[in-house]
């Protein structure tokens, strides 16, 4: 069963490969994403993050989810030498980590419900589990210069995939060390990681590093990356190609 809804300002697709899955099972996942949006959306006046930014809550009043995200954000800032930073212009915006974290929590929900073969895609960040019809999941990496074109097809099982770039949302990632300088040397960076939370946070940080980001990913155990720069040149990590499905243009 496969369903799509527009939530958190993006399309979210949930596909579960199991004859016993019901619409209620999938709706619980979408309900969870709605709750996450109600907590962390900086566009909603009454969200918890908006109240935090207005100084209406003290730390003791933060929800457990807020405390978790803020702690994970600080951990990521330290692990990336400050290239991941949720504070900008005196405001806190954890969107660079919330999406991957929420997808992973949704995946845990499906596993706890007894499902082992599924796919969750929220705005291009993806968690897959098990397989589809006995084969690994196939995930396409789009050409940032021509969105209808697939440049690589990945074959993955039990992995997270996250892409950071400027093709869809424009300039929304910045280098915290030079916040007023637009990132123009790369346009897309796709990361394969042990789960989508890990892939998402490091994709955001590595993109902020510019062309050096792919070398940061190379040094991370358990991660692979594929970068496309502003000249349409691709650079990828040493183990990336083992996930590439050769001579096949079909994709999810």
Language model regions located:
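Mature catalytic core of soluble alpha/beta enzymes
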Residues: 1-252
